[in-house]
Amino acid sequence: MVNNETDTREKGVDMWTVHDRYGNKIYLTAERWHHILESRPELAAYLDELLETIRTGRRKQDMLIPNEYRYFKEFDKLLPENNHLVAVVIFKTRLDEMGNSVPNNFVITGWAKYIVPKR
C-alpha cells in the first residue's frame, strides 16, 4: 500500500482513506460501502479495485453538480459483463476543531459498467 493512504480495515475503523492522482484526500465509509453492496452485491470482492479507481482512475466533473466527480478505471477481471468500476465522489469542506475550513471529500456510491472502447 502507498504511504499516502490509509487502509483501516485491520484497525476496526469504518473508513478507508486514499489520495487521488491530484492529491485530494477522499474517504469511503463502511456505511457507504454497505450501501453499494446492497444493490450491487457482485462488487463485494472489489473493494481494493474501487479504492484503486479513486487513486489512479480518470475523473469527470458532473455538469449539473460541480462538486461531484465520477472516477472511472478499467479492470479486465470484471469481464465479460463489465470492464470499468465507477466511484462517485462529492467534494466539500468542513470546519475543523480550530474553525478552519478543511477538505471533506467522500464516496457516495459506486458501480461496475461496460464502457465501449473508443476506436
Task: Please state what every model-predicted region is.
Residues 1-119:
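Ribonuclease/tRNase effector modules and their secretory precursors
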